[in-house]
Amino acid sequence: MEIRTPAVSGTFYPGDENELKDLIHECFLHELGPGKIPPTDSDQKIYGVICPHAGFVYSGPVACHSFYSISSSTSKLAIITGPNHYGIGQNVASMVDSSWKTPLGLVEVDSESALELREDLGILELD
């Protein structure tokens, strides 16, 4: 299994798990954030959120509004999209049989869903 390492860990956000958890906690409580820690249960059904992705120092509290809204979701699948910052490789791509490494642990790519999206969209390439 391929593991994709983070490109900006330690710069856009802390590379240490505990430091990152502390910063996330601060972002939720920040005056520009939701102002509270997310609930653990909700009957609200969320279909998607838009979340800024700059360094936490710039957008962390605002991003926490999105995370707050999905915090109690029981969904088993999240489709995370982002830009191709470097213009290298495919315009729209996903990986299969792989994971993304984060300071909080590995996030496994749902290979079956990625392959279904590739088939359905016709523009998704495998990276």
Which sequence ranges carry the predicted segments?
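Active-site histidine-anchored catalytic micro-motif
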Residues: M1-D127
